Amino acid sequence: MGQKVNPISNRLGIIRGWDSNWYGGNDYGDALLEDSKIRKYLNARLAKASVSRIVIERTLKLVTITVCTARPGIIIGKGGQEVDKLKEELKKITDKDIQINIFEVKRPELDAVIVANNIARQVEGKIAYRRAIKMAIANTMRMGAEGIKVLISGRLNGAEMARSEMYKEGRTPLHTFRADIDYCHAEALTKVGLLGIKVWICRGEVYGKRELAPNFTQTKESGRGGNGNNNGGKNFKRKKNNR
């Protein structure tokens, strides 16, 4: 079963927290739709900022949005002007007050979302898919990952019949729930059609639940109006295999 299901959803409540944290009651459907609109808008608006994860928390009158990105300077802007502009734009989606926290991804090579999107953009830029994948695998393993697996599907090299190719290095134990497996599915639009790219990255083993991975650090500028606390690296240990 671990080979079929999304490894992130398979670890929810074990070593991974939810991306939406709130109680909706009778307004659950409206809040869920609002979260979807916020994420869709932010992913389109911040396409060049290498956004990895968007976590939304809600209270009665406040919506707290945590954006994990590899390029926080693009989102924050000079003196925080871009953050203020972003808040005003998001108020058109929700009628509640907005608080935005920016977390920087310290090692983007270990983030499956960023790796998958980088491969997709390179393939769209007419770089050979084998070269893009092998470079991504080499960079990820060099940064300390225990393993990585990349699956690409579609009309590769313009072939008449679609096929799939898998490239992997190291270990990615999908059935081990304490294994910190990051996963993403991205798409690359080429002249011959759409290519699907899936990436699994094993970052070690985790003992104890945490909400945000230690791969994130909060930027100083993002604490404007917020509490500025980051408990992401609390109450867990990482185990490395000695091989």
Curated annotation (Swiss-Prot):
PROSITE patterns reported in the protein's UniProt record: KH_TYPE_2 (PS50823), RIBOSOMAL_S3 (PS00548)
Keyword rRNA-binding (UniProt): yes
Cited SUPFAM superfamilies: Prokaryotic type KH domain (KH-domain type II) (SSF54814), Ribosomal protein S3 C-terminal domain (SSF54821)
Pfam family, one: Ribosomal_S3_C
Keyword rRNA-binding attached: yes
GO molecular function: mRNA binding; rRNA binding; structural constituent of ribosome
Biological process annotations from GO: translation
Gene Ontology cellular component list: cytosolic small ribosomal subunit
Residue numbers spanned by region Disordered: 217-243
NCBIfam families: rpsC_bact
Family to which this protein belongs: Belongs to the universal ribosomal protein uS3 family.
Protein name as catalogued: Small ribosomal subunit protein uS3
